[in-house]
Curated annotation (Swiss-Prot):
Catalytic EC class: transferase
Protein name, as recorded: 6,7-dimethyl-8-ribityllumazine synthase
Protein family (similarity comment): Belongs to the DMRL synthase family.
Active site (UniProt): H88 (proton donor)
Matches recorded under CDD domains: Lumazine_synthase-I
UniProt xrefs under SUPFAM superfamilies: Lumazine synthase
Function text: Catalyzes the formation of 6,7-dimethyl-8-ribityllumazine by condensation of 5-amino-6-(D-ribitylamino)uracil with 3,4-dihydroxy-2-butanone 4-phosphate. This is the penultimate step in the biosynthesis of riboflavin.
Organism lineage string: Bacteria, Pseudomonadati, Gemmatimonadota, Gemmatimonadia, Gemmatimonadales
Binding site for (2S)-2-hydroxy-3-oxobutyl phosphate: D85, T86, R127
HAMAP family assigned to the protein according to its UniProt record, in alphabetical order: Lumazine_synth
Record-linked NCBIfam families: lumazine-synth
Database matches in Pfam families: DMRL_synthase
Length: 164
């Protein structure tokens, strides 16, 4: 049996961080945490782009557009959806996560989820550089780890259109 895992190595990588402006008191630290983690693992600062979108709902379409450019090795999506008194939370959180997963699947590129879905602002702040760490940084490190795993164990196939 063979076992493989990746390490969060950033040298030579080009990463896009797509961040939601809504709840910016939380999302700015998430985006900053992602960028800091990427640079800390060797991604050149000039190889990181940060795209700001209005809200979490717009994260999937922006990630798809970024990946369609073929400029990026991975995407890190960060945002915060905080529960209110209506079912809006469930729709936005679920469909945003689904859209990001579909982008990853469709483009065969890691898209990591730094989307906080919390009941309160305090819970979100605790996960955006507070007592529970920075989930933007965690998502960035996960992207690098998956890329390294792919390099080590799951290289892309160079098939022609006939699958040969």
């Amino acid at each position: 049996m063979a076992e493989f895992s990746g390490e969060p190595r950033g040298e030579g990588r080009r990463i896009v961080v797509v961040a939601s402006r809504f709840n910016e008191g939380v999302t700015v630290p998430l985006a900053e945490g992602a960028v800091s983690a990427l640079v800390g693992k060797g991604v050149a600062f000039d190889n990181i782009d940060v795209l700001w979108v209005p809200g979490a709902w717009e994260l999937p379409v922006a990630v798809r557009r970024a990946l369609s450019s073929e400029r990026y090795d991975a995407a890190v999506a960060v945002g915060a959806v905080i529960r209110g008194d209506t079912p809006h939370f469930d729709i936005v959180a679920g469909e945003t996560a689904r859209g990001l997963m579909e982008a990853s699947r469709d483009f065969d590129v890691p898209v990591t989820l730094g989307l906080l879905t919390t009941d309160t602002l305090e819970q979100a702040e605790a996960r955006a550089g507070g007592v529970h760490g920075n989930k933007g940084a965690d998502a960035a490190l996960a992207a690098l780890e998956v890329l390294d795993l792919f390099d080590r164990a799951l290289p892309a196939n160079d098939y022609d259109e006939d699958g040969e």
